[in-house]
Swiss-Prot record:
NCBIfam families linked to this entry: L29
CC terms in the record's Gene Ontology section: chloroplast; cytosolic large ribosomal subunit
Full protein name: Large ribosomal subunit protein uL29c
Subcellular location: Plastid, Chloroplast
Example of a GO biological process term: translation
The keyword DNA-binding appears for this protein: no
GO MF entry, a single one: structural constituent of ribosome
InterPro entries found in the cross-reference section: Ribosomal_protein_uL29, Ribosomal_uL29, Ribosomal_uL29_sf
Transcription found in the keyword field: no
UniProt similarity note: Belongs to the universal ribosomal protein uL29 family.
The entry's keywords: Chloroplast, Plastid, Ribonucleoprotein, Ribosomal protein
Length: 66
């Protein structure tokens, strides 16, 4: 599964971006919790979720300056 491109999320509204940020933070927390309790975790998802979160935060920051 390739990492998502920033072009895929640039057209989102501010509300959609906020919702996705909250959702991704929850997913990252859940992954960390699973890892801490030694449940089966696909470790590559950490990188993907953090990458998506960074993209969303960048888009959010850029839209605040416009």
């Amino acid at each position: 599964m390739p990492l998502p491109k920033i072009q895929d999320i640039q057209d989102f509204t501010d509300k959609e971006i906020e919702e996705k940020i909250i959702k991704l933070k929850k997913e990252i927390f859940d992954l960390k919790l699973k890892q801490a309790t030694r449940q089966n975790v696909r470790s590559h998802l950490f990188k993907h979720k953090k990458h998506q979160l960074a993209q969303l935060l960048t888009i959010k920051k850029d839209s605040n300056y416009v």
